Amino acid sequence: MKSVLILAGLVAVALSSAVPKPSTIKSKNVDAVFVEKQKKILSFFQDVSQLNTDDEYYKIGKDYDIEMNMDNYTNKKAVEEFLKMYRTGFMPKNLEFSVFYDKMRDEAIALLDLFYYAKDFETFYKSACFARVHLNQGQFLYAFYIAVIQRPDCHGFVVPAPYEVYPKMFMNMEVLQKIYVTKMQHGLINPEAAAKYGIHKENDYFVYKANYSNAVLYNNEEQRLTYFTEDIGMNAYYYYFHSHLPFWWTSEKYGALKERRGEVYFYFYQQLLARYYFERLTNGLGKIPEFSWYSPIKTGYYPLMLTKFTPFAQRPDYYNLHTEENYERVRFLDTYEKTFVQFLQKDHFEAFGQKIDFHDPKAINFVGNYWQDNADLYGEEVTKDYQRSYEVFARRVLGAAPMPFDKYTFMPSAMDFYQTSLRDPAFYQLYNRIVEYIVEFKQYLKPYTQDKLYFDGVKITDVKVDKLTTFFENFEFDASNSVYFSKEEIKNNHVHELRCATRLNHSPFNVNIEVDSNVASDAVVKMLLAPKYDDNGIPLTLEDNWMKFFELDWFTTKLTAGQNKIIRNSNEFVIFKEDSVPMTEIMKMLDEGKVPFDMSEEFCYMPKRLMLPRGTEGGFPFQLFVFVYPFDNKGKDLAPFESFVLDNNLLASLWIAPLLMHYSRFLTCISRIFSFTTRVNGSLTNSIFLRMTHMIMLFQKIKF
């Protein structure tokens, strides 16, 4: 990377009562062949807990013979392995599937291979029909979801939002109980009484108002953040990330970005934690708590969620992690952490055919792989037992569930599913612990020299930001997959069940950037948000604050000689997406030869409405950093991972570290650093200030 320019401004995020109208769905046109295939894919996600014997997938799947069609797969060995496991006995139907359990995961990978190595779409579809009819529902959905995302001939096809596929993973038992009662009564016996409990009917939909977990049931301060940790868009985002790059995924086998996988892992969690930290700050909670494997963890968690047969395990406050049941796991976790520190102290790592120099910035790939403990860390020649994985063991210990009853039966915890992990405060404490270990590696990197930082002839002269306001709005999603329907109901297009809750959003805003350039050049502009003060109101230094930087946008621009004025609207920020479109609307769009653009091309991005943290009534100060550097597109062949790796340079949080840790040495080579100051409810000259108005709650029972 060559040269970085920085502009730091103080901004304040505000909370407003204004609720703007939803934006128009951005779509793209598709041909008739695409529409036919897309409808076939979507058919697998309807009424997922039961079989529709009248559907095409059932008629094909019940008689499809995989062995007789062996020539229609590009990897016969993988097909033979699947058949061997299938004949031995796959996971029974109706049991809960989790990828964090050995036997269930091995079977799901074998099934994914069957899908992945299908020679053409027709074979892929028939294989999916077979699995939909004969295999466990959750296991099928997991493998099929990833297959659609990863198969080259499925590029552009839409998969439904995870909260429509697995609605029970995105709402608590209170809402489920309302849905079950309504379904069993075949509607609302007494509409007036139902309305008092937040249930009403609109056309062909039953709507259920839902609260987030509150202080009555969730008796520690973490409940203030449930509007964020239980947000269905954020939890779906995490599931998309796993589907994009599963921890068991072998890059050489499936063709993923092997050279930057660990970098992506670190970047994803650093950004997720920074975003979570923003919410902690604006809610007065401060830094993410730390914990010890040998001491009780202060933060309890009560999921109030259900599987088909059991409730989720609960973890009380001050839960003792180091119990007799966990002795072996805790010993492994502690040893794994100490081993990494020993690697750093030696300055290098050498094993599994790898030789890593920790002074090389590219060593971040190994470091990230080490903490994800993924398949690329060891290579194809090493058989990896993921039951002795750091992440798997840590999730098991913190989840506080009892030991599994057998290879398929377990009491789940929120940590057992990617759809629910973000709901547990211990999740953030665990990954903050991992990221802090990775940051220790950063201390071994050399600071940038002047020739690496200086963008010759280019200087940022000014940045202005519109007023920033946040608000809460109503949102509904289709929860029909949480219940069973009769054959007649399925045939006659049954009434849909909608779960309704509030969610965080913000008003659109512009960022105005002025750049003086002596040369015409292709440049990259990055914008990052960072806190100005810690939870005690003490200004944060750049050296100590770089891990809290949250990337807002990345884009290329052509600089001309002279003054360049750049106006960037928040709706253009490329690493965010609009909310997913319901399946019912997707089917209507397909009839018009269209699909939602964001769900087709940018499904794995963070929801656009969550780019800003919840504001406060008086305004909460943040800093905006703007960087400009030359565009380096050499060797960029990273699709479909462009959502994580955007150019040939290291990701923002990686190259910013040695810059900021040593920035005082290089002030002379950085064109300009602005540090605006402002005060709440004031307006100072040349400051970027955003005022807030009072928020009006949409549901009076919900208190944030």
Curated annotation (Swiss-Prot):
Subcellular location: Secreted, Extracellular space
Chief localization: secreted
Keyword check for Secreted: yes
InterPro entries assigned to the protein according to its UniProt record, in alphabetical order: Di-copper_centre_dom_sf, Hemocyanin/hexamerin, Hemocyanin/hexamerin_mid_dom, Hemocyanin_C, Hemocyanin_C_sf, Hemocyanin_N, Hemocyanin_N_sf, Ig_E-set
Signal peptide per UniProt: 1-16
Statement: the UniProt record of this protein carries the keyword Cell cycle: no
Tissue occurrence: Fat body.
Domain of life: Eukaryota
Cellular component terms (Gene Ontology): extracellular region
GO terms assigned for molecular function: nutrient reservoir activity
Keyword annotations from UniProtKB, A to Z: Glycoprotein, Secreted, Signal, Storage protein
Residues bearing attached sugar chains per UniProt: N72, N211, N681
UniProt family annotation: Belongs to the hemocyanin family.
Main function: Larval storage protein (LSP) which may serve as a store of amino acids for synthesis of adult proteins.
Protein name per Swiss-Prot or TrEMBL: Sex-specific storage-protein 2
Lineage of the organism: Eukaryota, Metazoa, Ecdysozoa, Arthropoda, Hexapoda
